[in-house]
């Protein structure tokens, strides 16, 4: 197997998919700030206190469901999890455009936090299934770049939609791409290298062998107590740089 060719195939096939998926998640998470400037607070009677509550509800869902999402992605399927999340967060984003009261908006923001909580850990697990230890730093960097790049084009698109139509239409329109992309994701993505047809059998075997070799000697962490007693975790927490 030519490892360089193998890495190139994986890089050009997988990373654009990862980048687009994470960008869409950030889009549906961050466009509320544009709506706030465009009049959603006045239209729905959102006070400063309610605005703080809405933000807290989003991150409450995000906080409590990130670990369960990561566990499902690791033990079951990143492909299935992200497919469901894409449909739900796109639907929640579009539903935000038709709400007329604060309780409905609060429920949507909480659900949006829940379904988006799994995105980052699931993407990291997906990358670890496809890239070796020496390749993951670059792959993870490309994933994180989805945030600032999305801000650049989202500012232009959201500003145009608000100017041309209004904040309601902005939410409805910007939620649609996530739903459409869910079906693209389902067709394009497989959880493991062994499941794809665009790698040769020898390439799959060599990649899986290297990934398995890297996992040897790594002790599984079964609970939070073990995690906090880990030497690496203690050193990380003690690092004040």
Where are these regions (language model features)?
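Residue-level signature of mid-helix packing/kink "hotspots" within the transmembrane helices
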Residues: 30, 59-67, 117, 151-152
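Extracellular/periplasmic helix-loop-helix junction of adjacent transmembrane segments
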Residues: 33-65
